[in-house]
C-alpha cells in the first residue's frame, strides 16, 4: 500500500510551489495547434515575449498554476485511490472464493460432528442440572435433618439408659463359669452362714480349694470358708482382708497373703493350695499365681471330725463357742470346691474358665456336696 506516500509527496510539492519567492514563468502558447484549414492572410504582428508582467499578472498566473496543480493532484489521487480500491476488491473476492469452497466442502462433516456432540452437550446440561439440585439439597439439609438428628440422639440416650439398666441387672444376677446357682449372704450376721457336709473325711496332708466370690463389703477379716476342730478352730481358713487374700493352715502363724487381688462388687475366682511335704503354699487370683511360699505347716496333717462352714468362723466350736458378726461375709459365693491334692497350674486355670462350674472337687464338689444355708442366706440363680 503506497497511497499514503504518494499523497504525502503530492502535498509537499504543492506547498513548496506556493511558498516559493521567485517564479520563473514561461509563456506557453495555448492556441489550438490543430490545423483547421484556415490560414492567416497576413503575418502576425511580432510581440515582445520578454515583456515584464505586472504584479497582478504574476498573481493571476500563480493562481492559475495553483488551480491546475490542484486539479492534477486531485486527478492523480483519484486515480490512485480507484486503482487501490479495485485491487482490494479483487483481493477480497479471491479470499471470499477460497473460503467458500472449503466451507461448502466441509458442511456435511460439520453437521455430522454437531449431531455427534448433541448427546454430550445434553448430558452435560443434565449433569449441571443434577449438580445444582444436589447443591441446593445440601444447602437445605441442615434445617431438614436437625429435627431428625435430635430424635435419633434422644432415642440413643433412651437406649443407653435402658442398656445401663440391663447391664446393672445382669451384674446383679449374672453367675460366672456357667454356674446355675449361688448362695446369697444379704448382710453380715452371726446367724447367716452355710454349713458344708463333705462327701469324704477332711483328713488331709495336701489340698487345693477354689471359690467364686462377689463381695459387697469387706472388713479386716471376712471369712470365705473355715474348717476347725475343738482343738484348733483355725485348721484351714481362706478369708479377705480389705482387698487382700489370706490362706491359713494349721494355725494363725501359718498364713500367706496376696495384696490387692479382689474388687468389691465384681466376681473373682480365688484358689489356694498347700502341701505338708515341704510346707509349700500358693494363692491364685483369676487364673494368675499371686503369692507362693514354703515351710508353712510343714509335716502337718489336717485332722478329720471338724466343722466346715462358708461365710463364717466358729470360735471354739466344740466347747460352747459362737460366731462373730464382724467376721461374717456379705455377698455371693458359688463354685466352691476342695480337692485332696495340689492341682497343677493348668487345672487351676481350667477351674476358673468359661463353663467350668461342672469341674468339681473330690472332697467338696459344688452342686454335689450338701451345703445348708442358715439364717438369711439363700440360694439364688
From Swiss-Prot:
GO terms for molecular function: (1->3)-beta-D-glucan binding; complement component C1q complex binding; identical protein binding; virion binding. GO terms for biological process: extracellular matrix organization; host-mediated suppression of symbiont invasion; negative regulation by host of viral glycoprotein metabolic process; opsonization; ovarian cumulus expansion; positive regulation of nitric oxide biosynthetic process; positive regulation of phagocytosis; response to yeast. PROSITE patterns: PTX_1 (PS00289), PTX_2 (PS51828). Keywords: Disulfide bond, Glycoprotein, Secreted, Signal. It is found in: Secreted. Glycans are attached at residue 220. Disulfide bonds join 179-357, 210-271. The keyword Ubl conjugation does not apply. Residues 179-381 form the Pentraxin (PTX) domain. Residues 1-17 form the signal peptide. One of its GO terms (cellular component) is extracellular matrix. It comes from the Eukaryota. PANTHER family: PENTRAXIN-RELATED PROTEIN PTX3 (PTHR46943:SF1). Plays a role in the regulation of innate resistance to pathogens, inflammatory reactions, possibly clearance of self-components and female fertility. Homooctamer; disulfide-linked. Binds to C1q. This is Pentraxin-related protein PTX3. It comes from Mus musculus (Mouse). The gene is Ptx3.
Amino acid at each position: 500500500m503506497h497511497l499514503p506516500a504518494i499523497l504525502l509527496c503530492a502535498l509537499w510539492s504543492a506547498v513548496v510551489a506556493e511558498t516559493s519567492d521567485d517564479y520563473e514563468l514561461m509563456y506557453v502558447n495555448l492556441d489550438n495547434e490543430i490545423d483547421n484549414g484556415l490560414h492567416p492572410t497576413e503575418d502576425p504582428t511580432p510581440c515582445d515575449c520578454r515583456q515584464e508582467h505586472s504584479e497582478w499578472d504574476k498573481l493571476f498566473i500563480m493562481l492559475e498554476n495553483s488551480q491546475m496543480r490542484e486539479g492534477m493532484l486531485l486527478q492523480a489521487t483519484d486515480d490512485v485511490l480507484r486503482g487501490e480500491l479495485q485491487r482490494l476488491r479483487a483481493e477480497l473476492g479471491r479470499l471470499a472464493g477460497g473460503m467458500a469452497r472449503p466451507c461448502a466442502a466441509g458442511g456435511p462433516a460439520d453437521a455430522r460432528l454437531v449431531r455427534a456432540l448433541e448427546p454430550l452437550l445434553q448430558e452435560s446440561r443434565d449433569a449441571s442440572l443434577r449438580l445444582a439440585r444436589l447443591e441446593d439439597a445440601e444447602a437445605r439439609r441442615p434445617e431438614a435433618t436437625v429435627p431428625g438428628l435430635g430424635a435419633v440422639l434422644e432415642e440413643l440416650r433412651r437406649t443407653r439408659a435402658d442398656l445401663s439398666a440391663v447391664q446393672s441387672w445382669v451384674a446383679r444376677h449374672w453367675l460366672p463359669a456357667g454356674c446355675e446357682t449361688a448362695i446369697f449372704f444379704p448382710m453380715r450376721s452371726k446367724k447367716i452362714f452355710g454349713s458344708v457336709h463333705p462327701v469324704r473325711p477332711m483328713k488331709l496332708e495336701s489340698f487345693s480349694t477354689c471359690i467364686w466370690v462377689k463381695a459387697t463389703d469387706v472388713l479386716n477379716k471376712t471369712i470365705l470358708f473355715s474348717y476347725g476342730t475343738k482343738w484348733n478352730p483355725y485348721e484351714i481358713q481362706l478369708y479377705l482382708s480389705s482387698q487382700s487374700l489370706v490362706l491359713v493352715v494349721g494355725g494363725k502363724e501359718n498364713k500367706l497373703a496376696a495384696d490387692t487381688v479382689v474388687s468389691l462388687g465384681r466376681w473373682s475366682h480365688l484358689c489356694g493350695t498347700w502341701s505338708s511335704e515341704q510346707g509349700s503354699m500358693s494363692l491364685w487370683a483369676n487364673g494368675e499365681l499371686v503369692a507362693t511360699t514354703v515351710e508353712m505347716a510343714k509335716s502337718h496333717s489336717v485332722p478329720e471330725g471338724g466343722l466346715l462352714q462358708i461365710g463364717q468362723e466358729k470360735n471354739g466350736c466344740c466347747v460352747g463357742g459362737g460366731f462373730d458378726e464382724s467376721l461374717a461375709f456379705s455377698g455371693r459365693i458359688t463354685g466352691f470346691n476342695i480337692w485332696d491334692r495340689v492341682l497343677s497350674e493348668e487345672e487351676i486355670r481350667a477351674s476358673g474358665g468359661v463353663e467350668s462350674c461342672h469341674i468339681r472337687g473330690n472332697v467338696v464338689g459344688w452342686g454335689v456336696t450338701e451345703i445348708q444355708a442358715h439364717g438369711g442366706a439363700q440360694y439364688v440363680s
